[in-house]
Amino acid sequence: YGDCLSKIMSFAGYDVTREYYINDAGNQMYNLGVSIKERYKERCGLECELPENGYHGKEIIQLAESLYDTYGDSKLGEDIPFFKEAGLDILLEGIKKDSDKFRVNFDVFTSEQSLYDRGFVENTLNKLKNSGKCYISDDALWLRTTDLYDEKDRVLIKSDGNYTYLLPDIAYHSDKLNRGFDRLIDVLGSDHHGYINRLRSSLEMVGYDSSKLEIKILQMVRLLRNGEEVKLSKRTGKTITLNELIEDVGVNAARYFFASKSLDTQMDFDLDLAVKNSNENPIYYIEYANARISSILRGKEIPKDIKFSTIESDSAYTILNKLLEFEDVIISAASKGLPHLVANYLFELAGLFHSYYSVEKIVTDDEIYTKERIALINAVKVVINNAAYMLGLILREEM
């Protein structure tokens, strides 16, 4: 979603920075370090005692294996921070590698820990305390976010002295606004619905315009195989990684299927449909349209200054009208944050071309007739490929 939206916005003329926020601080990172160390001990032939709140997935075993390959058993005496940092480095390298494979590019990687190291979190805490909106209850420090948009007040510092996620998140968004961005778009998972109003309220309490922040909530994805849901659980180790999905269905299918659904729609990803070589599969249908046009245009000169004097059929006029819609679709998708508008437009345009191709000859002995239709289908190809670019698709020229 985020990569498609950034490409659409760039195409529409926005100056876009793609940023990845690394959650490398807090208890979950400590649990990661513990989990890796236990798996490393296991790899070294010692007893493994994974904590209940640790990570049980196969990727932790792979991380431990990687560390063993590098160090042997020489790191058995290291404390949790070593395994946390080593694991983070390997995971981040994998994220970058998988993102690149998925054609997702980031301009900036920002570390949560760096916000602590640079004093941003403490500065933010002091600003909030000075705002008069903080109070102590049950030995915890609370922020009175109900004074603005939130349904309940939020804890900043827990009774055990640990910071909640909210505090560094306020610092992070403050930092982005300090860098001069006019519009911030967060792309978050479906468990973050309550996050929107608490963050907006918090930003206003430290002096920022919260209307500059937009939070896009992605829905959970159900993977289907043979018509049945593939059950997944990160904690129990039953997962399908992005890399495995790409290997299974290909980058084009994965990207198109994800982009084609609106944010408020449950995403059912049919793994069988995604690899079908038939018109039932939308990415196949789109690629087939592009390949058909490419085959017709191959070796032909693209005419200019065409008047379309011989264009008379309803199917041709329908295509022309659809092409005229393209600019409005891009503007709407960019301004409203709706990449699925481009995905749906692309599918519809491909369908109109297939219909046109089935009822009207394109190449005939009539030179003017042929030139006008060559110009028409070339325009279709240009728009198909522009839309495909914005969705991160690389379409085949032959099938």
Model-derived regions, located:
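Non-catalytic interaction-recognition regions
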Residues: 1-399
